[in-house]
Amino acid sequence: MDIINIAWAALMVIFTFSLSLVVWGRSGL
């Protein structure tokens, strides 16, 4: 496992999570 691949995967997970959290918050739940 390359450290760059791990960092990129973690960045994608955090970005997807925060994006879905913003969408979930805007839908009023």
UniProtKB/Swiss-Prot annotation:
GO MF terms held by the record: electron transporter, transferring electrons within cytochrome b6/f complex of photosystem II activity
| Superkingdom | Eukaryota
Q: What is its main location?
A: plastid
| Family matches, as Pfam families | PetN
Provide the protein's localization: Plastid, Chloroplast thylakoid membrane
According to its UniProt entry, one GO biological process term is:
photosynthesis
**How does the entry describe its membrane topology?**
Single-pass membrane protein
Q: Which SUPFAM superfamilies match?
A: PetN subunit of the cytochrome b6f complex
Query: What are the protein's UniProt keywords?
Result: Chloroplast, Electron transport, Membrane, Photosynthesis, Plastid, Thylakoid, Transmembrane, Transmembrane helix, Transport
Question: Which cysteines are cross-linked by disulfides?
Answer: none
Does the keyword field hold Metal-binding? no
Q: Can you supply one Gene Ontology CC term for this chain's record? A: cytochrome b6f complex
Chain segments annotated as transmembrane: 3-23
Recorded family membership: Belongs to the PetN family.
Relate the protein's function as given in its record. Component of the cytochrome b6-f complex, which mediates electron transfer between photosystem II (PSII) and photosystem I (PSI), cyclic electron flow around PSI, and state transitions.
Quaternary structure and interacting proteins, as annotated: The 4 large subunits of the cytochrome b6-f complex are cytochrome b6, subunit IV (17 kDa polypeptide, PetD), cytochrome f and the Rieske protein, while the 4 small subunits are PetG, PetL, PetM and PetN. The complex functions as a dimer.
Please give the name of this protein: Cytochrome b6-f complex subunit 8
Source species of the chain: Marchantia polymorpha (Common liverwort)
